[in-house]
Amino acid sequence: MTIKVLIIDDSALIRSLLTEIINQQPDLEVVGTAPDPLIAREMIKQKNPDVLTLDVEMPKMDGLDFLERLMRLRPMPVVMISSLTERGSEITMRAMELGAVDFVTKPKISIANGMHEYSEMIADKIRAASRARLIARKPLTPVAGGAGLPLVGNPLISSEKLIIIGASTGGTEAIKSFLMQMPSDCPGILITQHMPAGFTQSFANRLNALCKISVQEAKGGERVLPGHAYIAPGHSHLLLARSGANYVTQLDDGPPVSRHRPSVDVLFSSAANNAGKNAIGVILTGMGKDGAEGMLKMKQAGAYNFAQDEASCVVFGMPKEAIAMGGVDDVSSLNDMPGRVLQYLAANSGRALRV
């Protein structure tokens, strides 16, 4: 069945390029284009599209205002089209909070060539969006003094324990939901979320303002500390390494792995090699199979692994593949998972195991 797409963008060039890219796919069809949200409102009623692509910054009505109204009145899958700027990344993070499924970045130079290089990725994101489960967003407020789940036992966790997280489509909100429930003395956390360079810094800043723990973009060489989360930068793979008795972050700008840089498989494999039984793996919502092989390696090295269940995923791709490959010990909803991870830690942290 053909997926019907409506393009909303004030740039005639972007409307033309997206139409060409989308219509080249046998299962996708552009049913209309609109230069602004006001025209788009009528077209949505007429054309009944399956997926919208929406420019982040537009005249007449702001893309975020339109998205907020759309999600309140007529929820549907939306893929944001964003500029590779700090402002663009911050607006895109807000769009994900409002309910957008995913986003595509416009190249800074040579837009036509750049967009065509992204054509397969754009098509994949639209397909995933058409199947996405739209999840009602709750308004978020920064965490106050005692928020976060309580730790069982005191002190619960030695600095040897680690939580290793991978996610893709829908992952920005899933990671936020997970981290907001982490107490300030939880183990160190390493995260790979598929996201372009520049956006990971905005993502880390937003999480840092909302969470009880400290959240930062990994720079490489940091000692991994309890109560801290380190997010892979969009330009490099993030790895876990050892430095004497300590765990440290390591960056690698080598080629994509499993079609991605940063890659979840790279992070998970490094955790298998360097943390073994001290690691807890978490695979969240996402398209594709990045992370499935790495999670199996973690399990074989003695880690205990959690996967997000289908009902709470925006896209049940990466968790499904990890479960099918046999690397998952516990499948749970996004709401339940932080508590289950902390329960597991409480039951298994009498003493961290040296590897």
Swiss-Prot record:
GO cellular component: cytoplasm
GO biological process: chemotaxis
Coiled coil: none
Record's subcellular location: Cytoplasm
Record: active site: S168, H194, D290
GO molecular function annotations of the record: phosphorelay response regulator activity; protein-glutamate methylesterase activity; protein-glutamine glutaminase activity
Post-translational modification (record): Phosphorylated by CheA. Phosphorylation of the N-terminal regulatory domain activates the methylesterase activity.
Protein name, per record: Protein-glutamate methylesterase/protein-glutamine glutaminase
Protein species of origin: Methylobacillus flagellatus (strain ATCC 51484 / DSM 6875 / VKM B-1610 / KT)
Name of the gene encoding the protein in the UniProt record: cheB
